[in-house]
């Protein structure tokens, strides 16, 4: 297979993988109130897809997943969001771990 065709096929597979991750993300969001375990399973599938295809999880999805127990985080349901000294601190209510994301203060 020529190099250009191989690259085109790889791009197609990566696009399909990203679309599937977004679809699973939406399903996890819908399933969380009724069935949290199924929601966690969808998050695990997102991680498996990204590892299998060696692509990173999109930032919008990654920020809604606990980095320790891989549960889907929803503010007010199973996560606590706080602003603390230039950081957004997200506390997972399932495992109790905290994730810190910096933000830029407006002058």
Curated annotation (Swiss-Prot):
Binds 1 zinc ion per subunit. Zn(2+) binds at residues 66, 69, 92, 95. Its cofactor is Zn(2+). Keywords: Cytoplasm, Endonuclease, Hydrolase, Metal-binding, Nuclease, tRNA processing, Zinc. Transmembrane segments: none annotated. One of its GO terms (biological process) is tRNA 5'-leader removal. Its EC number is 3.1.26.5. Its main location: cytoplasm. It catalyses: Endonucleolytic cleavage of RNA, removing 5'-extranucleotides from tRNA precursor. Pfam families: Rpr2. One of its GO terms (molecular function) is zinc ion binding. It is an enzyme of class 3 (hydrolase). GO terms for cellular component: cytoplasm; ribonuclease P complex. It is found in: Cytoplasm. Consists of a catalytic RNA component and at least 4-5 protein subunits. PANTHER family: RIBONUCLEASE P PROTEIN SUBUNIT P21 (PTHR14742:SF0), RIBONUCLEASE P SUBUNIT P21 (PTHR14742). Belongs to the eukaryotic/archaeal RNase P protein component 4 family. Part of ribonuclease P, a protein complex that generates mature tRNA molecules by cleaving their 5'-ends. HAMAP family: RNase_P_4. This is Ribonuclease P protein component 4. It comes from Methanosarcina mazei (strain ATCC BAA-159 / DSM 3647 / Goe1 / Go1 / JCM 11833 / OCM 88) (Methanosarcina frisia). The gene is rnp4.
């Amino acid at each position: 297979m020529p190099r250009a065709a191989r690259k085109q096929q790889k791009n197609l597979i990566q696009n399909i993988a990203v679309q599937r991750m977004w679809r699973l993300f939406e399903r996890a969001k819908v399933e969380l109130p009724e069935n949290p375990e199924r929601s966690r399973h969808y998050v695990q599938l997102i991680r498996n897809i990204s590892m299998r295809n060696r692509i990173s999880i999109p930032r919008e999805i990654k920020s809604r997943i606990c980095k320790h127990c891989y549960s889907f985080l929803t503010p007010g349901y199973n996560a606590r969001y706080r602003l603390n000294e230039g950081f957004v601190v997200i506390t997972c209510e399932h495992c109790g771990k905290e994730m810190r994301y910096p933000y830029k203060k407006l002058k």
